[in-house]
A protein has these predicted regions:
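Non-catalytic helical/linker scaffolds that mediate oligomerization, partner binding
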Residues: 2-572
């Protein structure tokens, strides 16, 4: 039996679930009411926004981790969009002084941020996922980062930082050069497959079939398109080019042929070594580079199953060959990353924004998390403030529905890593405050078993949005928390789980705050313990209401029922 429960002072009033047609009718009326309420509140928020400063200000000092009020969290970092008073009201709308950001932030760890102090500060400023870029560094340095992140998670049990290992992939790169080579427009410049060659007009490449893969007239893009050359001729071991757009060629720069992909395996021998390293160190996610088809994902997942490794696979969409296979690639994966750098090098650059929107939409429809990456705050590698275009780029990704946004060089080797995270947090938070909270009923074409779960997630979201309550979900697998995230409730989803690996994975999903807690055989004890945790952590207050959701084959409520929704008042 399925039931909705609404309770006051812990005395539930139960309403049994009605037939689907009636449920949909009920949900429509609730949605209409919620839409009207949202319209008024949106107008009020616009008035508040007009009073807020739009100038992003940064301070050189690092966040104080020893605040008298306890450890600093990313919610306590002052932002330019914050109201001057702690709590304010406008009409009937209560303005929260300490809202929680729902879009997650992935930070690449590198020389600028690999110390214990900086990893702590990144986490407190807003980092949700630490990314290890296997194109740089060695296993020893990455092991140090993994250990530091795990130390942080152990020290702050209410905080969760996941670890993502990003494979190098089948990249074609130029060789090492003693000093940067200045390429000038019209200049002749050569690439050779002979190793160790470096001169003013010739440099080596790391790919033996490079000469076979390129043709006369092909456009070569260097370093993500920062420089471009046209192929004029080729011989047995040399490709002769003419510079179209010049620039500074440094060591190991990435090479692309516009409209083509190299005939290399998606997972190289080095990648397999790095993947085994990830298994041994229990990372949470793999980000697999240059995935061209679903077979690559199946091969990796088969390997992980053989190892007994519970690691999710994020596919990086960055190859021209992947575009015709998008649906099957995303379906086979556990999520996707829009890697716009190489995508924009292999395809016409004007296609990238449209592909970004399409990939986000596809992931959302399949309930897979999606990360938007590359050049989001590129100027902040060297400058303390972002360009206005970069701010808009973050806002667009948030509005399109990305689960996470990613920083690469900004935090790996940039001069202002903490400021970059703070800007990303601030812009995402401000953008989220302007988004609609309307929900759409799940399609009737969904199989019945999964349809029941999506229906309850839809109704729970509608109820939480209408009553303006956060959601508490109890989950052993993470499935219901993920489904709730798909409907984008206006408040936080507190996902309580008794599985550490599930807690780590859920941190990537939009709006989900995972919390580890052992479940009791006594349902009321489990509820009370969860509410007590939230109150003690300052995440909820006495007198507030919360929507409780539980769904699954092993419910913590009644044995005969697998789906429940309750609304409860938090007691002191």
């Amino acid at each position: 039996m399925a039931a909705f429960n609404v309770s006051s002072k812990m005395t539930p009033l139960k309403f049994h679930a009605v037939p689907t047609s009636d449920r949909l009718s009920w949900s429509k009326s609730v949605s209409d009411f919620a839409a009207g309420l949202h319209s008024r509140r949106r107008w009020e928020r616009m008035q508040v926004a007009a009073l807020r400063s739009m100038k992003i200000t940064e301070h050189d000092q690092m966040p104080d981790l020893t605040s008298q009020n306890g450890p600093l969290t990313f919610d306590t970092v002052k932002t330019p969009f914050e109201l001057q008073s702690s709590d304010s009201t406008l009409g009937n709308q209560r303005i929260m002084s300490n809202p929680r950001r729902k879009t997650k932030i992935v930070c690449t760890i590198g020389p600028s941020t690999s110390s214990r102090e900086m990893i702590w500060k990144l986490a407190e400023t807003g980092m949700n996922v630490a990314r290890l870029n296997m194109s740089h560094g060695d296993h020893a340095s990455h092991k140090k980062t993994i250990d530091l992140v795990k130390e942080y998670n152990a020290q702050f049990e209410d905080k969760v930082i996941a670890i993502m290992l990003d494979t190098k992939g089948p990249e074609v790169r130029s060789g090492d050069v003693p000093k940067p080579i200045m390429l000038k427009e019209g200049q002749e410049f050569n690439f050779t497959i002979k190793r160790g060659v470096s001169s003013e007009n010739t440099v080596s490449v790391n790919y033996d079939d490079f000469v076979n893969d390129v043709e006369v007239g092909d456009i070569l893009l260097v370093d993500g398109g920062m420089m471009s050359l046209v192929v004029k001729s080729k011989s047995k071991d040399l490709v002769k080019c003419q510079v179209i757009d010049g620039g500074e060629l440094k060591s190991r720069r990435h090479l692309n042929v516009r409209g083509k992909s190299a005939t290399l395996p998606s997972i190289t021998d080095k990648d397999w070594e790095d993947i085994k390293f990830g298994v041994d160190n229990q990372v949470d996610f793999y980000a697999v580079s240059f995935v061209k088809d679903a077979e690559v994902v199946h091969e990796l997942k088969d390997y992980l199953r053989s190892c007994g490794a519970d690691i999710h696979v994020i596919v990086k969409i960055e190859s021209a060959d992947s575009i015709p296979n998008l649906h099957s690639i995303i379906s086979a994966s556990d999520g996707a990353m829009v890697a716009r750098g190489d995508l924009g090098a292999e395809l016409p650059i004007e296609e990238v924004p449209l592909l970004q929107e399409d990939i986000i939409r596809r992931c959302h429809s399949m309930q897979k998390p999606v990360i938007v990456a590359t050049n989001m705050l590129e100027s902040m590698i060297n400058h303390p403030t972002p360009t206005r275009a970069e701010v808009s780029d973050i806002a667009i990704a948030v509005r399109e529905g990305a689960d996470a946004v990613m920083l690469s060089g900004e935090t790996a080797h940039g001069k202002y890593p903490l400021k970059a995270v703070k800007v990303m947090h601030t812009v995402a938070l401000r953008t989220e405050s302007s988004l609609s909270t309307s929900t759409t009923p799940p399609s009737q074409t969904i199989p019945y078993k999964s349809h029941m779960g999506t229906m309850f997630a839809f109704h729970a979201t509608t109820m939480a949005n209408t009553l303006n309550t956060p959601i508490i979900v109890f989950t052993r697998t993470g499935s219901m928390a993920i489904t709730l995230s798909h409907y984008r409730p206006s408040s936080t989803i507190f996902a309580f789980t008794n599985e550490e690996r599930v807690k780590q994975r859920l941190v990537l999903y939009h709006g989900v705050m995972p919390i580890f807690m052992q479940f009791s055989d006594d349902a009321e004890e489990t509820f009370s313990r969860a509410l007590s945790i939230l109150v003690n952590k300052g995440l909820m207050k006495e007198g507030e209401h919360v929507t409780l959701v539980q769904s699954g084959a092993q419910p913590i409520w009644r044995v005969e029922s697998t789906h429940h929704i309750q609304v409860r008042k938090v007691q002191g």
